[in-house]
Amino acid sequence: MSAENSRSEALLPLRNLWNSVKCSRDRVRDGESNDSSGTFSLANFWEILNEAVKAVSQEATKLSLMFSKPPLPSDEDCAKMGECVQKSVLTLCTVYFWLPKSQGVTLRRSVRDATAEVLEGLVQLLDVILSSPGQSLSQEQLTSTGSVWAACDHFDQIPKDNRSAVLAVLSSCVGLVKDALEEMQQALAESQDPFGDVLDDDDDDEGGRGNQDRYWSASDRQLIGQCEGLLKASAASLRKLSSAVRHNAQLETEQEIAQLDDLADAAAHVSPCVDDLALSLYPPVDRAAVEQNVCRLAAVLKKLLDITRSSHVCAEADVSWVEFLSGAVEHNLEKVRSLLRSDS
């Protein structure tokens, strides 16, 4: 048998492992949880899951060390190593699938993404090892090993219940909306039309202003000012909802947990709508797109506030801000639409 054939045979367990880990990763991304029956202990789940994650990290370290310098491990050692890694991966996947949706879809999504990230890191590590087996430890292999460690360590930071998972989603939404609003305000402050002092917006003579596609006109700025009110209402709605969830959210019943999921799903639609509106406000301003995006954002905010009002996180003291922001959304929507009608 040639040296090349011998090496290929020795690496066969790793190729099989690579395929198996890829399949496990895809199953985690796409698969459903097992049916829950009886009592489920979230505390026990986390204890067992953390042990499973630790085992994957340890096996990845052993795998990387085994292939950190020549010569190649023996066929037997490769096979044993593959079995150990495979066992740790199957254990991790099995434990993940224990988590039922009744504990919260948002929580489960967070655990799913973290689990898939560990498996993706392992796939990348195996890719590197298989592409250059028997060579000295490369920077690429070090980086891939570190990525597996980082993905495993990330489990310490992920939410441990659905309330925390929903708060994490809301915090991300608040940050994204805040960034979009600040970018728009900064662009307005920095953008000046160098011809604005000598040519007005109505100058459409041939050979006149050729820079209107890059600067806001006075009417554009007026429109943006009205739209800014809706953007601020978006940020305020998400901040107030975050506070209500932080102080009032309960996890005693499946209905309460499901209501939190509904809030997270509704909130997740706000940021993309804010981005679409903000982008349509950059020059050249497309007023038809602005109207479409304003209406879409207002509808998303109204739905979010309606879901908030009917959920258990809306205490008696919260009704006033929900009603105020609902009115603010409607008021800003009408102001923008009125301005667009007057411009047409």
Swiss-Prot record:
Highest taxon listed in the record's lineage: Eukaryota
Gene3D superfamilies per the UniProt record, alphabetical: I/LWEQ domain, Talin, central domain
Protein name, as recorded: Cyclin-D1-binding protein 1 homolog
GO CC terms, sorted: cytoplasm; nucleus
Plastid in keyword set: no
PANTHER family linked to this entry: CYCLIN D1-BINDING PROTEIN 1 (PTHR15492), CYCLIN-D1-BINDING PROTEIN 1 (PTHR15492:SF1)
Similarity comment: family membership: Belongs to the CCNDBP1 family.
Region Disordered: start-end pairs: 191-215
Protein task: May negatively regulate cell cycle progression.
Cellular compartments annotated: Cytoplasm; Nucleus
Organism from which the protein derives: Danio rerio
Keywords noted in UniProt: Cell cycle, Cytoplasm, Nucleus
Keyword presence, RNA-binding: no
Encoding gene per record: ccndbp1
